[in-house]
């Protein structure tokens, strides 16, 4: 299995505690509201803590797909949230899993800096294509932007 690591960063105007709550705690309720392709999130295994596996169902090209999302670690005190995409037809066939290590830091003017380390675990000795990496990055960035947009549009959140 090959492992390919990339670090990304996203800057938000939302304060770290509020952005963490939306991304790590309330995403299951927010995602279907802000991403029209998302059909729902359900717990397949676990109690919501580390080790929990969730199924995110998505409508793509007119058919329902899903990806399995495993919660690896939660560090509420430091706004850390680690998870992996571990299966389902929505996970590219060349990938064994994709692990995300996320931490939200205080940014300027009360906003946040979301730092993400992404580890792509490919099957066998397969290389990671730029297309797969770009698609995964675009979906991740889109998810963060959509959830951030929800928080900004709902001041009472």
UniProtKB/Swiss-Prot annotation:
GO terms for cellular component: cytoplasm; nucleus
Alphabetic keyword roster: Pathogenesis-related protein, Plant defense
BP GO annotations: abscisic acid-activated signaling pathway; defense response
Alphabetical list of Gene3D superfamilies matching this protein: 3.30.530.20
Protein family: Belongs to the BetVI family.
Source organism, top-level taxon: Eukaryota
Induction section of the entry: By abscisic acid (ABA).
Organism of origin: Pisum sativum (Garden pea)
CDD domains reported for this sequence: Bet_v1-like (cd07816)
Entry annotated with the keyword Transport: no
InterPro entries registered for this protein in UniProt: Bet_v_I/MLP, Bet_v_I_allergen, Plant_def-hormone_signal, START-like_dom_sf
The protein's name in its UniProt record: ABA-responsive protein ABR17
Signal sequence residues: none
Keyword Zinc listed: no
Pfam families: Bet_v_1 (PF00407)
Molecular function in Gene Ontology: abscisic acid binding; protein phosphatase inhibitor activity; signaling receptor activity
């Amino acid at each position: 299995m090959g492992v390919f690591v990339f670090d990304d960063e996203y800057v938000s105007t939302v304060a770290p505690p509020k952005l963490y709550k939306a991304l790590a705690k309330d995403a299951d309720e927010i995602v279907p509201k802000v991403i029209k392709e998302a059909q729902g999130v359900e717990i397949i295994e676990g109690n919501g803590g580390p080790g929990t596996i969730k199924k995110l169902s998505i409508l793509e090209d007119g058919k329902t797909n899903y990806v399995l999302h495993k919660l690896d670690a939660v560090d509420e005190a430091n706004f850390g949230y680690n998870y992996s995409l571990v299966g389902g037809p929505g996970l590219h066939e060349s990938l064994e899993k994709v692990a995300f290590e996320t931490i939200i830091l205080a940014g300027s003017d009360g906003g946040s800096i979301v730092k993400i380390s992404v580890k792509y675990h490919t099957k066998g000795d397969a290389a990671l294509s730029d297309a797969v990496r770009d698609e995964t990055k675009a979906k991740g960035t889109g998810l963060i932007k959509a959830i951030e947009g929800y928080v900004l549009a709902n001041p009472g959140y």
